[in-house]
């Protein structure tokens, strides 16, 4: 058995690395749906269908758990797949399996509260708001998942999402540092204009953006805290396996990288982040 990690492209490698560092003995299969990346601008039904196909591929390859290392898939497809598709597929395989996303641990990190906690709404006006900026794909921003779920738990946090329609595609294509920095700066300034000031904290709400986290740090005021999805997801997954011993993550330390796109090495931007050559096999 193994842990499957699924993303529309290479952004999920940021989560994959954090999971491997936390669970080094586990076997991992990474699947990038690069033939259909990015997901952020696709209709919801397409995102659900593509995410389901990716999960099926990973379960058929022996995964006991699939982590959706993609905010768009987690926001739009996860709950629906858990409720309507997963029970039947679990029965067909005849073994324990599950699918988890990355938004729940991110919201727990952003609020400092467990997912199960929902604040009592008292109705009084909160004088001092913590301004949280979320940089994401258009699909994630349109879902308003961060605004809705954080507001349930913390009325003293105001969430402002900034959709970045081109950024994930640019990272997939290996755009240069100057081009990427210009795009990041543009979105940071757009968010600042809408809010009236810089955010107090920020979530990089697309796993691709972790690859260029240094550019966001440079564009935001010095010291602005970034909530890192890979770290919060690794924390959550470690606890999840402790609570669910029926799910086997494997013990061989295997690493497999698959793509629905063109097999072979990844672009220089990705390999610089990874720290060396990285070849994907055909899914």
From Swiss-Prot:
SUPFAM superfamilies xrefs: Aspartate/glutamate racemase
Catalytic function, reaction form: L-glutamate = D-glutamate
GO biological process, one term: regulation of cell shape
Catalytic site: 70 (proton donor/acceptor), 206 (proton donor/acceptor)
Cited InterPro entries: Asp/Glu/hydantoin_racemase, Asp/Glu_race, Asp/Glu_racemase_AS_1, Glu_race
Pathway connected to this protein: Cell wall biogenesis; peptidoglycan biosynthesis
Entry protein name: Glutamate racemase
Species of the source: Caulobacter sp. (strain K31)
Protein family membership: Belongs to the aspartate/glutamate racemases family.
EC number: 5.1.1.3
Keywords assigned: Cell shape, Cell wall biogenesis/degradation, Isomerase, Peptidoglycan synthesis
PROSITE patterns, sorted: ASP_GLU_RACEMASE_1
Function: Provides the (R)-glutamate required for cell wall biosynthesis.
UniProt superkingdom: Bacteria
Broadest EC class assigned to this enzyme: isomerase
GO MF term list: glutamate racemase activity
């Amino acid at each position: 058995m193994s842990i499957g990690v699924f993303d529309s492209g290479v952004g999920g490698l940021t989560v994959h690395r954090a999971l491997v560092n936390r669970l080094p003995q586990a076997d991992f299969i990474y699947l990038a749906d690069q033939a259909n990346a990015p997901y952020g601008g696709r209709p919801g039904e397409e995102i659900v269908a593509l995410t389901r196909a990716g999960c099926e591929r990973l379960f058929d390859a022996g995964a006991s758990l699939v982590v959706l290392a993609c905010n768009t898939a987690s926001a739009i497809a996860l709950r629906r797949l858990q409720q309507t598709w997963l029970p039947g597929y679990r029965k067909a395989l005849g073994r324990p399996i599950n699918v988890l996303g990355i938004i729940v641990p991110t919201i727990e990190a952003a609020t400092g509260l467990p997912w199960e906690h929902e604040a009592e709404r008292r109705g009084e006006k909160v004088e001092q708001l913590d301004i949280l900026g979320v940089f994401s794909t258009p699909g994630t921003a349109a879902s308003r998942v961060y605004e809705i779920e954080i507001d349930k738990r913390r009325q003293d946090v105001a969430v402002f999402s900034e959709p970045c329609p081109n950024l994930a595609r640019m990272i997939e294509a290996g755009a240069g540092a100057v081009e990427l920095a210009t795009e990041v700066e543009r979105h940071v300034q757009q968010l600042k204009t809408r809010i009236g000031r810089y955010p107090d904290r920020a979530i990089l709400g697309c796993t691709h953006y972790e690859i260029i986290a240094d550019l966001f740090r440079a564009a935001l005021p010095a010291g602005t805290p970034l909530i890192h999805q890979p770290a919060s997801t690794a924390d959550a997954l470690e606890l999840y396996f402790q609570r669910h011993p029926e799910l086997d993550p494997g013990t061989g330390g295997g690493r497999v990288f698959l793509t629905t796109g063109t097999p072979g090495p990844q672009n220089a931007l990705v390999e610089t982040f990874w720290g060396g050559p990285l070849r994907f096999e055909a899914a």
